[in-house]
Regions:
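Aromatic-residue-lined binding/catalytic grooves and analogous aromatic/hydrophobic interfacial grooves
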Residues: 2-6, 12
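His/Glu-based metal-binding/catalytic segments typifying zinc-dependent metallopeptidases
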Residues: 14, 21-33, 37-115, 256-257
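A positional "C-terminalness" feature that preferentially activates on distal terminal regions of long
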Residues: 245-246
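M16 family metallopeptidases and their MPP-like homologs
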Residues: 1, 19-28, 79-100, 108-215, ...
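C-terminal structured domain segments
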Residues: 41, 49-53, 203-206, 220, ...
Length: 257
């Protein structure tokens, strides 16, 4: 068994660690480029050429399952998460989704989950891949928080704000987009954009959509949030009593020791 594992890992290494698969990311001034080039040439010389005529991207056939798990702990607070995806149902991403995060984080979710519900925190996001989530943490509630999440579309459908308040939401969103970054963070953002094929044009488009967001667009986004919630994906960690009281929400309940 040990010899077989070694053989498999050696074969895998020969496919992965080849010149054709090498990518290098550097965050530096021009003075840092020369040392990299010198060291990189030595590394490239030691890497073998690929034995494959054409490097193929792996095809994944993973089939996700709906877990909907509840985990019991000895603690007295809960962590409740709802997630889903809207792009799989044909809803395109819009920069207004980032404004939604600000609106919900500082208004509806803040008031309902933190102020009224007593949770230590709550957060949400709706990404460019269509993934959306709403999460509470150190929350005295479980089923009640899930009900708050379910009512987000209704809140958005009735959303209204004057020009001053709407501008505050937009400024709050832009402040997150324009957070000062360290050189390391700038480099990481750049490499992530390259790896995921995000262009400057896409970033600018998202920014323009944030700046032009209005109440009507926020109301229209209720459909996107409804689609995310329609997946019905939930996971929660909490006390035995709270998890049992909400057992109809879960496909499986387990105990965390």
């Amino acid at each position: 068994r040990k010899e077989n594992l070694i053989s498999v890992l050696q074969a895998l290494a020969k496919k992965v660690f080849v010149k054709e698969r090498l990518s290098v990311d550097l965050t530096s001034g021009k003075e840092g480029l020369k040392p990299l080039e010198n060291g990189l040439s030595r590394l490239i010389d030691r890497l073998p050429d690929s034995e494959e005529e054409k490097l193929l991207k792996p095809e994944y056939s993973m089939k996700p399952i709906v877990g909907n798990e509840g985990f019991k702990t000895a603690g007295k607070v809960q962590y409740v998460a709802r997630v889903g995806n809207s792009s799989e149902k044909g809803i395109a991403y819009n920069g207004v989704n980032k404004v939604l995060k600000t609106i919900l984080g500082y208004d509806y979710l803040w008031n309902e989950v933190r102020v009224k519900g007593g949770a230590y925190g709550v957060m949400c996001a709706f990404t460019d891949l269509g993934n959306g989530y709403m999460v509470s943490y150190r929350d005295p509630n479980l089923a009640e928080t899930n009900e708050v999440f379910e009512k987000v579309p209704a809140y958005l459908e009735a959303f209204d704000a004057d020009e001053r308040d709407m501008m505050k939401y937009i400024i709050g969103t832009v402040s997150e987009l324009d957070t000062p970054l360290t050189p390391r963070a700038e480099g990481r953002r750049s490499s992530q954009a390259w790896l995921t094929d995000i262009t400057f044009e896409q970033i600018q488009k998202e920014r323009d959509e944030v700046l032009s967001a209005d109440c009507e667009q926020v109301r229209e986004a209720a459909k996107m949030v409804s689609t995310v919630l329609s997946d019905g994906y939930i996971c929660a960690i909490g006390s035995e009593g709270k998890v049992e009281d909400a057992k109809e929400l879960f496909n499986e309940i387990r105990v965390l020791n």
